[in-house]
Amino acid sequence: MKKILVVEDDPVNQTILSDFLAANGYETLAASTGQEGITRFQKDAPDLLLVDIQLPSKSGIEVCREIKGLAQGKSTPIVLMSAVYSDHDRPSPEDQAASLADGYLTKPFDLVALLAKVRQLIGEA
């Protein structure tokens, strides 16, 4: 079973994502801070990470860069997520490129688009 690590500090969003992915056949792991996400990644070697951009301890962009800098993280897909209320909230194209992320999704979630992105990156569960 393919594993997905959800790094999200909002417990409601974390539960929605984890439950939805589990219902679609994926094993889910969770972390609530950037540092916890990095630690879980190193311990559990997930197939994909969904990482909120605004996290306690380290931003999602920092988490992405750090994981992509690890030998085991170079080929692991990472999708950044962010609430977008205005253009000011949206990461710039430069920030998105510099993060080394493999995708970007906005909140509130379009679960169909989320599942399509997951399947594009790691295939069916």
Question: What does each model-found stretch correspond to?
Answer:
Residues 33-36, 59-62:
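Acidic catalytic/metal-coordinating carboxylates
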Residues 62, 85-105, 116:
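Alpha4 helix (beta4-alpha4-beta5 surface) of REC/receiver domains from two-component response regulators
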Residues 25-32, 40:
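Short hydrophobic/Thr-rich beta-strand motif most characteristic of the beta2 strand and flanking loop
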Residues 8:
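Conserved acidic carboxylate
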Residues 30, 55-58:
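Residue-level signal for the "D+5" position in two-component response regulator receiver
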Residues 110:
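Receiver (REC) domain switch/active-site region of two-component response regulators
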Residues 52, 82:
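Active-site residues of response regulator receiver
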Residues 15-23:
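Charged docking surfaces used in two-component/phosphorelay signaling
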